């Protein structure tokens, strides 16, 4: 499963792009973030081996690949930008629903 998040209206390479998971009835879970300027990536240990974050600067798009999806990966996934100086998630995408049949 590959999710995409196209940026607009700001300097793509000046902000971290975060990915956040929300399962039905549960809270938000931070997956990780990538800095488009150099592709530096920081992942929640829980998602190492599960989520791969990449960016395409030419199309100002961030991607998240989920490896070997299972029903546990069924959730709404959000991308959200954060400035480098405080990491506050200040602008969120609308979310993408992923359903994996068991």
Task: Give the positions of each predicted feature.
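Extracellular domains of the immunoglobulin superfamily
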Residues: 1-102
């Amino acid at each position: 499963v590959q999710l995409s998040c196209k940026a607009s209206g700001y300097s793509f390479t000046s902000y971290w792009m975060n990915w956040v998971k929300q399962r039905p009835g549960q809270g938000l879970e931070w997956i990780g973030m990538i800095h488009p300027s150099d592709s530096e990536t920081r992942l929640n240990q829980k998602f190492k081996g599960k989520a791969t974050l990449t960016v395409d600067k030419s199309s100002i798009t961030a991607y998240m690949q989920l490896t070997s999806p299972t029903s546990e990966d069924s959730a709404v996934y959000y991308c959200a930008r954060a400035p480098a100086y405080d990491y506050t998630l200040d602008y969120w995408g609308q979310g993408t629903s992923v359903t994996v049949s068991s």
